[in-house]
Amino acid sequence: MPDAPPPATTGLPRATTTAPGAPVDRGGFILAACHHGAEAELCRRQVELLPELRRGAWRPGAVTFRLPAGCDPPDDFFPDLVFARTIIRSLGQVAAPAGSDLVAAALQVAGSAAWRNVHVWPRDPRADVDATTIRTALLAGLGMAPEATPCAAPGDLVLDCMIDTPERWWIGWHRAATPASCWPGGIYPGAMPADKVSRAWLKLDEAIATFAIPFAPGQRACELGAAPGGSCQRLLEAGLDVVGIDPAIIDPRVASHPRFTHWRKRSRDVKLREFRGFDWVVSDMNIDPVSTLEALGRIVAEAGVRPRGIVATLKLPAWSRAEALPAWLTTFREWGYVPQVRQLSTGGREICCLALRSGREVSRPRATRRPGR
């Protein structure tokens, strides 16, 4: 039996054993898919977290990284790159003129493995490609039922196919573990029903699925900048009692709900003592992220205000603003919260942060407020 490769001199996790059924050719590259425009910030995060990786190909919506020699991460490797929708082991590309049998070429590259699902998605969501037809052909080639659900189950070994162009596909694989790794391309499969009042409903729906936010019926939540009420609508559906804070009008479908209250004013005009008793503070305001943090900090600085969690969308006026992300996360920790962040597939140039109360006592930030507030 040949000697095992020497341990990699890297901080990357390394698989100590190969899970049964995994591909023999595990691939020497990582492919990370992301929003168009987020590539540089994804790479910035990679340098901070995994500097041993070496950047390879760069396309709008996808970046590849070469693994160090001897490094073989676990099958479910999904580092916290924030801007990565999904992360797969890349086996390379297949390319052929239009009309050629790319499916056969893709299956040859994939090789034999205990595949349980197939994920197909376009690198460019605007591209005129039929991902469903391609997936059906790949399933047939693997002897799998064509009606197999596109979403994988945790533990499934997934064959990945990212459509770069109609003539070129990227082939790879991963083992599903996190919610996003169960969705093709890391794109949330949920749809927004016609009775929802704004896209904020869908973003919060994805956040709940991504972070497993522990909302519970009977809890109280307030939303800063609530109009027209999409997030409030989703909170109400989760069984919470909701206060929406916004001088603008709330959609009647939300405003008429018996568990909804509208404070028709700006959040900074609310007396701080009124925030006592809320379990959750939610914010998706279209303002600078520093201003969002100031609004939240003003609230958590108040004695007696200690929500169990914060769900905040941090807008990025420019992608480069994300370089301040480590400082923003430090701010949450200084408040006594443990933050998790991710750029949601249903959002735009923004990141979503779930910050849960840590349970440890911390010094309160000072808040500047007018007398009587």
Feature annotation, model-predicted:
Residues 1-373:
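SAM-dependent transferase fold signal centered on methyltransferase-like domains
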